[in-house]
Structures are given as structure tokens and as C-alpha cells.
């Protein structure tokens, strides 16, 4: 348990809120609550908030939350805003970012993501420890790539040779007669800068009074929930769409058309269920391709339309209630998590794409167990900032929400795509992020 998770244990284990089981998700949520409180302290210190429309607290009371300062000192403003803390606690752990990309909270408005690359020769040489090792580089005494190691796939035919170690006589003349194989390393970095989303809402005091009297609802709380939900939904969609745009096109071979898997042409079966199993084999091939290109691991999650998820279920492969996983994070409100495919893929349904269409789709992606092992990173800074104000002419209340976060891509992906290591948009590496692969499904 980290210092922050221990500090905010009462909030993280809030009764009635979805339980946070994953240790990383707890740590990130704790850091975001800490960032939230820090931002609130600064806002209160600079007088950016008007009175919080709540009853006066007793003199020795530190507010509804944990006191920002000493109890009894400006008691009404000393407590953390329970609306914001509750929204952060309930909403942030539900973001799909935790399952499909790395989540690295920022403590400052700018940050850097680093990647170390091994090189053959000098720092600008060809990358090592990525594809197959050159069997002759350290053993033939030439100090060059491809001198004795040739060919990449023996099944394709053509020249295919292997390098070997050098003799004792040659080893004794290294540096004079024979050349040492030299290696180096370079450190790549990608910058990430916090960006902002902002929404506002206005209401009248008469509306607030009537809503309270008739329905027992607080107008400010209801509008706050609407604004916060919209902001977080927009972030979810931004993450999903970034994956769609940057994912590599799959179905490179074994299909009539690149990027398309036609169940009538590319799958053989007497019944639909047999063809659906052919679709599963295609998903397996795309996951294997991700492993070959990233050298990190096979694809382990899928984003698809609801029709594709139904097809996989009908094939008997999609388990909605895995016997060994009793704490699945199923967000029924957004209907995104569908289940576990073949015991190893998390399946997420995109409810807004391709439903009822003739062409369906699948995106296969990889996210490692570490927050640093992913093709894309979501970097929250200040989860939610609530601003209260009053119209100077009508004196009617207004509220505004802001959130600050950054989106960054794996620096290795950017370097391989040839776009540099600065802050980029998804369109700059469209179809080049090899941590994700996408293909269209026809005749489902």
C-alpha cells in the first residue's frame, strides 16, 4: 500500500461505491484525488470560489471532509467539496483507459515519457533486441550486420544462412585484425502536455427551489453529475477513437482483401458457428502479429461491435461469467464490457459503431500488466475542477466543470512511424500503431 492509498483509504473503500480491487487502479485514483485536493486548495486560496451554498458548520468543525487547514479556521471553506471527491472516486476508476491503454497520472501540467532502445553500432544504428538477433554480428569478426547472417524466413526459399562464433586465432586479433561488434543505446522521449475540457450550466434559484420542493433533488448536484458524466464520456470516446485511427490494418494475408475478413469467402464452415470459429482464428493471428511487432506480448483485448460479440458468444467462446474471475469490472451503465473470450481476451463492446451495418469490425490490442507497457497513455492531471459563480445582472447561479489531462503515444511507435518524439495527434500516426490491429468483417 502506498502512502496516498493509505491516506485516502476511507474514500477508496467508500460504502456503496464500486469496489476497486486492482492495486494500480487504486493507486491512480488516490493520486487523482490528491491532485484534485491540491487544485481545490489553490482555488480556495486565490478566492476563485463563491460561497458553497451549504449550511454553516459548527465553529469547531472542519467541513464535511477532511480539513484542509486547522479545524475552526474558516470552517465552511476548509472541507473538501464532497461533490467533487465523490465524482472522482466513482467515475475515474470506470474509465476504459485502465483496460486498453496505460494510465500515468501527472503531477505537473507537462511531462515526458521515456523509452530506451538498444542499437547495433552507434546511437543512430539499427535497433537491436527487437527482431531476430544477427547470429554473425558478435562472432564473425566483421562488426557488420548481414555479413554472414542472411535471410529472414526459410519457408520463403532463397538465401538463408547463419553466422557462428570465431576461432581462437581470430579472437586473439580482435581490434587489430578482426573487428569487435559494437553496440550502443539511445533514449527516446515523448512529451505530453495537459489539455483541457470545459462545460458550464446555468439554473435559476426558482428552479432549484421547485426541484427541491417537488422532487427532493438538489439542482446543483444534478447538473454537476450531468456535466461530469459528459466530460468523462467524451474522454472515453476520445481514447476509443484514437485507437481506431492509429491501429494498423490487419488481415495482411490469408484473405481475399487486405483488412477485410469475409465470412462467405475467407471462412469455411457448414454452419454459422463453424464460420464464427474461423473468425476466432483470425483474431488469434492478429494477436500473434502484435506479439511479433511489439516483442512485448500477444494481443489481450478486443473492441468490437455488439453483433460481433454476439457471434462470438454463439460460437460458444465468449464467457459472460468466468468461473475464476468473480470481481470483473462490468460497467452495466455504459454496456462496454462483454466478457472474456477464449479465456484470455477482454471483450469490450462499442455501442455506437457499426450496429446493424452490413460491415462489422474488430480491433485487437495489447496492454501489458504495467502502466508503462502500452501503445497509448492517458495522463490525467486535475480530474474535475468545479467553478461556482453568479450572474452579475440576474444574480442567478452558474456552475462550470473543467478537467485537465494528456494523451500520449508510445515513443517507440512514434519513432518507428517517423514522426519524431514531440506531442502529436492521432492522425499523425494513422494506421501505424502496431499495439493495435483492426479489420472489417463482412457477411456476418
Question: Locations of the language-model features?
Answer:
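Structured alpha-helical bundle/scaffold domains in large eukaryotic membrane-trafficking regulators
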Residues: 239-247, 251, 411
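Acidic/histidine-rich catalytic neighborhood
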Residues: 250-274
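Extended assembly-interface regions of large multimeric machines
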Residues: 1-138
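Generic detector of low-complexity/intrinsically disordered segments
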Residues: 6, 14, 34, 55, ...
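Assembly/oligomerization interface modules of large self-assembling protein complexes
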Residues: 90-93, 103-106, 111-194
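Sequence/fold signature of self-assembling virion shell proteins
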Residues: 81-82, 89-91, 97-99, 161-165, ...
